[in-house]
Regions:
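Solvent-exposed alpha-helices and their adjacent loops that cap or buttress functional pockets
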Residues: 22-25, 51, 95, 113-114, ...
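Active-site core of metal-dependent hydrolases
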Residues: 1-68
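A short, hydrophobic/aromatic-rich structural module that often spans a beta strand
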Residues: 110-113, 168-173
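C-terminal cap of metal-dependent C-N hydrolases
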Residues: 118-171
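His/Asp/Glu-enriched, well-ordered alpha-helical/loop segment
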Residues: 43-125
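Short acidic-hydrophobic sequence patches enriched in Asp/Glu that either
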Residues: 14, 73, 141
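Short secondary-structure boundary/hinge segments and terminal tails
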Residues: 14, 41, 99-100, 133, ...
């Protein structure tokens, strides 16, 4: 696929005028990476929203990188654009999942549908957050708590070591 990798740079970013050219003169997907420039991340997200092009944005973690290993990098990307760039939390989540699935159409993940792999993450607002849901947590800048991670329909983790506990943990019945 055609992807503008690191639209927000790595240790340094391209000028905003070049970002504008890429956004205006191509229809390529645009990858925002966790270890990139936060100001350019905000600019790209806001401009894509103004242009009705949020479907072009995907997220990358870019770890390990020269910045190091960034645990929860994709969740941090979602939080940044939802809390800083005025993107609704549920849309930011879809940018990380469904948009990536559409760009890399050979993947059978990223979209919940019959025939797709059952790779799911159950999350909620973290304890202590002002948010009441995972989406609200993204929008106020809090990383949600993860309570179950399922791969191919099988629970692989029932508690996260890297996120705060959930206000309401998922239960298997």
């Amino acid at each position: 696929p055609d992807v503008i990798s690191h639209i927000n740079g790595g240790p340094t970013a391209i000028p905003l005028s070049e970002v504008d050219k890429l956004m205006d003169e191509t229809d390529f997907a645009m990858e925002i990476v966790q270890c990139g420039n936060p100001k350019v991340t905000d600019y790209v997200a806001r401009r894509a929203k103004e242009k009705g092009q949020l479907g072009r944005i995907i997220f990358g973690n870019d770890a390990p990188s020269g910045t190091g290993i960034i645990p929860l990098g994709i969740l941090r990307n979602i939080c940044q654009v939802a809390s800083v760039s005025d993107i609704p939390g549920e849309i930011a989540l879809c940018m990380a999942t469904g948009n990536s699935a559409k760009v890399y159409n050979k993947l059978n993940t990223g979209i919940i549908a019959v025939g797709r792999e059952a790779d799911l993450v159950f999350m909620d607002a973290p304890m202590g957050s002002v948010a009441n849901t995972a989406v609200e947590a993204f929008e106020c800048g809090d990383i949600p708590g993860l309570s179950i991670i399922m791969v191919d329909g099988v629970i692989k983790a029932a508690k996260s070591r890297n996120t705060p506990p959930c206000k309401r943990a998922a239960k298997v019945i």
